[in-house]
């Protein structure tokens, strides 16, 4: 009964466009503060939406530091631990900035932090690409329910959720508008993508 | 559900474009210091080669190892096959060992199809060349090379070869590369022309989805890519043309002929090249010749195929043609 009611319930926005811009500005300032000027920072977004967020963060960091910020993308599909539970997915783009990541402070950027498995895969992928000085994690939304000992260094919004809920991030570059929606999960339970 | 790659004709346009796009990402791995992905960790792939082919075998082996698969190489020479063991017994042995995929090269056309459909083995079957029938990964790597050179590396993503004019020259009769290429290029929207002496064209070629010509010189100016095929003397049991000299004069590509091609057009060859007969050294060493690129692209394509067939719990590649065989 409960479930049916949940499903009928409309997804409701928890963050709107201006909120997203504001939290990204805050994260940018936090990065500069913690990295003491962000001299050696490389931003790597996790496709799809993490890449857009990484680019936006890079713009904001450039405004603050007045320096060009290296930004790239890191596809983690081949490193997922659930590859064999689904049909193989089309690969997304991995693009590492020209100077590489050796000795740099890599900030991974993703839209939602959930089980932590995506970030685990990203750490493995980084391992094959180079050896960063340190790796930090920035996410727009942390919805909890971690399955691995992983936490984010920069969080846009902590959003306590139930496992019966879904968090959907929409960004202008991909979806035409900026919003974070909290809704009810349709039918079958499954892992976070 | 089928999970094999037996013929280039089995691939739909979407499948083929997915494989080419995936290969583009795989090619990036080759540029990295650590050329390895954990994707097929714990999966066992057997390279079952009943016919000699160092080039194709090491290409598959490199692809399998870059995806972290466990690789077993099997060559018929010195194995129980030379003692009289049948394909069925070999297959059942592999099945008992829990093999996940079999890459098979066989001199008999249809052997991979038999292996995939007989129920002897549960593994995915990838055809690495069977007789004069098919060599689908070769066709895919050729299409990949064409798309990269003619459309562009990044601009080509998601695109096919619509409207490109491709000419295949030489021994069409004995060439599985030609058959696979005609099938795949047609699926990808290219216009294919075959140029060969009448004796080296197979019976029924008029039913293939391509044009046929006997005159290379008139075809060159309107070609975006010219692919020369090796004259397969080992498969020839009769005289198909008078002399090598005459073949070379009419169907070989030299500098003068290459000059008739449009500026953007490329020269391709599946290898091994017979220099001086199908292709002169001048053409083979020019920067329009993609032979070395084709070899590098072969590894990326084979990684893409293995990932899409084995990476998940079911293959990502669908099959247009269910059961019937040519």
From Swiss-Prot, chain A:
GO annotation, biological process: regulation of DNA-templated transcription
Keywords noted in UniProt: Glycosyltransferase, Transcription, Transcription regulation, Transferase
Name of the featured protein: Bifunctional protein PyrR
Pfam annotation, one family: Pribosyltran
Function recorded in the entry: Regulates the transcription of the pyrimidine nucleotide (pyr) operon in response to exogenous pyrimidines. Also displays a weak uracil phosphoribosyltransferase activity which is not physiologically significant.
Residues noted as binding substrate in the record, renumbered to the chain: 48-49, 89, 93, 110-118, 143, 167
Similarity comment: Belongs to the purine/pyrimidine phosphoribosyltransferase family. PyrR subfamily.
Taxonomic lineage from the root: Bacteria, Bacillati, Actinomycetota, Actinomycetes, Kitasatosporales
Organism: Streptomyces coelicolor (strain ATCC BAA-471 / A3(2) / M145)
GO terms assigned for molecular function: uracil phosphoribosyltransferase activity
Enzyme class: transferase
The gene coding this protein: pyrR
EC number: 2.4.2.9
Keyword match Oxidoreductase: no
Motif PRPP-binding in this chain: 106-118
Recorded catalytic activity of this chain's protein: UMP + diphosphate = 5-phospho-alpha-D-ribose 1-diphosphate + uracil
């Amino acid at each position: 009964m409960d479930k049916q009611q949940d499903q009928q319930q409309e997804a409701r926005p928890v963050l709107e466009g201006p909120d997203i811009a504001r939290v990204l500005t805050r994260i940018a300032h936090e990065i500069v503060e913690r990295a003491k000027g962000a001299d050696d920072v490389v931003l790597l977004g996790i496709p799809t939406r993490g890449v857009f967020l990484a680019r936006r963060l890079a713009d904001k960091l450039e405004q603050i530091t007045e320096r060009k910020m290296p930004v790239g993308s890191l596809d983690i599909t081949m490193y997922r631990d659930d590859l064999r539970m689904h049909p193989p997915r089309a690969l997304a783009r991995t693009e590492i900035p020209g100077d590489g990541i050796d000795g740099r402070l890599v900030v991974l950027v993703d839209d939602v932090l959930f089980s932590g498995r995506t970030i685990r895969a990203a750490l493995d992928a980084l391992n094959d690409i180079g050896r960063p000085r340190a790796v930090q994690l920035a996410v727009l939304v942390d919805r909890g329910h971690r399955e691995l000992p992983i936490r984010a260094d920069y969080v846009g919004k902590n959003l306590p959720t139930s496992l019966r809920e879904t968090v959907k991030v929409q960004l202008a570059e991909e979806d035409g508008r900026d919003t974070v929606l909290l809704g009810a999960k349709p039918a079958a339970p499954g892992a976070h993508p | 559900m089928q999970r094999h790659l037996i013929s280039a004709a089995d691939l739909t346009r979407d499948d083929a474009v997915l494989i080419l796009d995936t290969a583009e990402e795989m090619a990036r791995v080759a540029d990295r210091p650590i050329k390895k992905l954990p994707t097929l960790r714990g999966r066992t792939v057997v390279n079952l080669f009943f016919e000699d082919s160092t080039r194709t075998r090491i290409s598959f082996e490199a692809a399998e190892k870059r995806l972290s698969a466990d690789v077993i190489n099997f060559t018929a020479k010195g194995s129980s096959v030379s003692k009289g063991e049948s394909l069925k017994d070999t297959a059942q042995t592999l099945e008992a060992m829990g093999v996940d995929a079999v890459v098979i090269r066989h001199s008999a056309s249809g052997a991979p199809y038999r292996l995939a459909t007989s129920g002897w083995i549960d593994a995915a079957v990838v055809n690495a060349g069977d007789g004069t029938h098919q060599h689908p990964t070769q066709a895919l790597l050729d299409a990949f090379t064409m798309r990269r050179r003619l459309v562009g590396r990044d601009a080509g993503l998601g695109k096919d070869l619509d409207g490109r004019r491709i000419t295949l020259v030489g021994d069409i009769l004995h060439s599985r590369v030609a058959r696979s290429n005609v099938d795949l290029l047609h699926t990808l929207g290219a216009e294919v022309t075959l140029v060969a002496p009448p004796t080296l064209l197979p019976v029924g070629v008029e039913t293939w989805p391509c044009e046929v010509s006997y005159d290379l010189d008139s075809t060159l100016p309107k070609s975006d890519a010219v692919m020369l095929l090796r004259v397969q003397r080992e498969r020839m049991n009769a005289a198909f043309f008078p002399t090598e000299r005459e073949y070379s004069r009419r169907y070989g590509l030299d500098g003068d002929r290459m000059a008739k091609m449009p500026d953007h057009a490329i020269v391709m060859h599946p290898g091994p090249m017979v220099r001086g007969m199908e292709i002169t050294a001048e053409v083979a060493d020019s920067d329009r010749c993609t032979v070395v690129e084709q070899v590098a692209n072969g590894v990326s394509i084979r990684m893409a195929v293995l990932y899409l067939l084995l990476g998940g719990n079911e293959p990502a590649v669908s099959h247009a043609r269910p059961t019937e065989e040519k």
